[in-house]
Regions:
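Active-site SXXK
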Residues: 145, 158-178, 343, 411
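A short, well-structured edge-of-sheet supersecondary motif
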Residues: 111-150, 402-403
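Active-site-adjacent helix/loop patches that line small-molecule binding or acyl-intermediate pockets
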Residues: 89-108, 118, 171-299, 310-330, ...
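Primarily EF-hand calcium-binding motifs
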Residues: 11-34, 51-69
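Structured C-terminal helix/loop/strand segments within mature extracytoplasmic catalytic/sensor domains
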Residues: 7-15, 21, 31, 40, ...
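EF-hand and EF-hand-like Ca2+-sensor regions
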Residues: 63-94
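Amphipathic regulatory helices of Ca2+-sensor modules
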Residues: 34-51, 71-83
């Protein structure tokens, strides 16, 4: 039954505070001590939070029981049960305090970048050569779980090399930094992602050679190595299931509301085609085995002897074939831009998934991963990309690019047309547009620029700061 409108003072108790009262009044209809339930919902949604967010799931169910209006005592119950997230959203104190303004700006960037039709599909993997080249989507997830989506954000696409930093993280979690880097280096290669050249360690430092360890975990050789390190004593099935389950945690699939996430999908056709055409990767696999750095799986096949005098059993090294099979399988997982953005936001949030609040990765693992991502994540264009965009990022030939803005957000752009380095053309352009509009480059620091916005502060405060700085400069003759 709907409650009668009572004077707000009659509800004051030890459970209420001036802060809560001020917040209630700020949401009330003019001249009424009541909040419209629909307005309350819309305020939360306009802040960038989603109705199917695990943390708001119970709240929205509760709101449906209040009818059309919320009175002060019910408001106190809501605030008490919903936790800090709702209060921050209502006060405009989430990671992006002006989510609407941010969304409008990214909308404009999206429209502009959509005009770019340059680039080619990844023709060397047949299923990827058949995708719609005009697909274009973006999703942005903040560390507070705010979500921006535009275009084909809900289309499945092959993550390909975007899996590499996460596989590296899984290996770090299992073995630790020192052990992993006995098998793979930390240096930018400056070479194509599938180059066969490895890195040699000697007393005189590092030098190029055809043997020893891969340069870093973000090129194919390094990714095959780190994938081979994950649960190396287990069967392929157990290892692949483990990796899929870890990705599910990263993208928030375990949340009650499922947050627009599905369990990672395996595209067997893509994996098979990579197997049929991946001779270069097979060569890398055997090269890694020859160096002695790929974990050796025990098997009795070597002991078998073909009894025919003019025949023998040709031996394929199972350590290589299984590492490659697992690597091809993980590259062939499909996700949406929103799911990948959630995984990127988990990295931005020091390993804690924004919507489940579960710690998926140790903070040290994330800290160790992001520098490698920054120096080597965009193939042989990594240096130029970081100079221009200034953010850790990873691309894949399926058309995806994700970016990590530490302590703020994860971004994923999907557009399958690629440049000569194998990076999404629109993905790179969109990343450049975002960092040209917003002060998110890692080396912006305290830099001020009247044309660039700090997304972490309310737009009104940013404008006031810019105006104040202009007045101060003018008063000192610096105009």
């Amino acid at each position: 039954m709907q409650k009668k409108n009572k004077p707000i003072n009659s509800y004051e108790s030890k459970h209420s505070s001036k802060r809560e009262k001020d917040l209630f009044y700020s949401l009330c209809d003019k001249n009424h001590d009541v909040i419209k339930t629909e307005n309350f919902k819309q305020t939360l949604l306009k802040s960038g939070l989603k109705k199917n967010d695990n943390r708001l799931y119970s709240l929205f169910q509760m709101l449906d029981t209040f009818g059309k209006e919320i009175y002060y005592d019910d408001f106190i119950k809501i605030i008490s049960s919903a936790g800090l997230l709702v209060e921050k959203a209502l006060r405009g104190e989430l990671a992006l305090p002006d989510f609407s303004d941010f969304s409008k700006n990214v909308d404009e960037m999206f429209k502009e970048v959509a005009k770019n039709k340059s680039g080619e599909l990844a023709s060397y993997i047949p299923p990827l050569a058949k995708v719609d080249p005009d697909q274009f989507g973006i999703s942005i997830v903040t560390v507070d779980g705010q979500v921006y989506q535009r275009g084909d954000f809900n289309e499945d696409f092959s993550i390909q090399s975007m899996c590499k930093p996460f596989n590296y993280c899984f290996a770090l979690e299992e073995l630790g930094l020192d052990e992993v880097h006995k098998h793979v280096g930390q240096e930018p290669s400056g070479r194509k992602f599938n180059d066969l050249t490895l890195l040699v360690r000697s007393s005189e430092g590092f030098q190029n050679n055809s043997t020893n360890i891969p340069f870093n975990p973000m090129i194919n050789a390094g990714a095959i190595m780190t994938t081979g390190l994950i649960n190396s004593d287990e069967t392929y099935e157990k290892r692949f299931n483990f990796i899929k389950n870890e990705f599910a945690k990263l993208i928030g699939w375990t949340a009650k509301g499922k947050f627009d996430s599905k369990f990672p999908r395996f595209n067997k056709d893509v994996a098979r085609e990579e197997n049929f055409t991946g001779y270069h990767n097979m060569a890398i696999g055997y090269l890694l085995m020859e160096t002695g750095n790929l974990p050796d799986k025990e098997n009795n096949h070597k002991k078998k002897v073909n009894q025919k005098h003019d025949n023998f059993d040709f031996y394929n090294e199972p350590s290589v074939t299984e590492a490659l099979k697992l690597y091809f399988s993980v590259c062939s997982l499909e996700m949406t831009a929103t799911e990948v953005a959630m995984a990127a936001a988990t990295l931005a949030n020091n390993g804690v998934c924004p919507v489940t609040q579960d710690r998926v990765l140790n903070q040290k693992t994330v800290r160790d991963c992001l520098p490698i991502l920054q120096s080597s994540g965009m193939y042989d264009a990594s240096g130029a990309f970081f100079q221009q965009v200034g953010l850790p990022a990873k691309s894949g030939v399926g058309g995806g690019v994700f970016l990590v803005i530490p302590q703020l957000m994860g971004i994923c752009i999907f557009s399958p047309r690629l440049d000569k380095q194998g990076n999404s053309v629109r993905g790179i352009e969109m990343a450049k547009q975002i960092t040209s509009k917003y002060l998110v480059h890692m080396f912006d620091g305290a830099m001020t620029n009247a044309d660039r916005i700090d997304p972490r502060i309310p737009i009104s405060r940013w404008r006031a700061n810019s105006c104040g700085e202009a007045i101060w400069a003018a008063s000192n003759g610096d105009i």
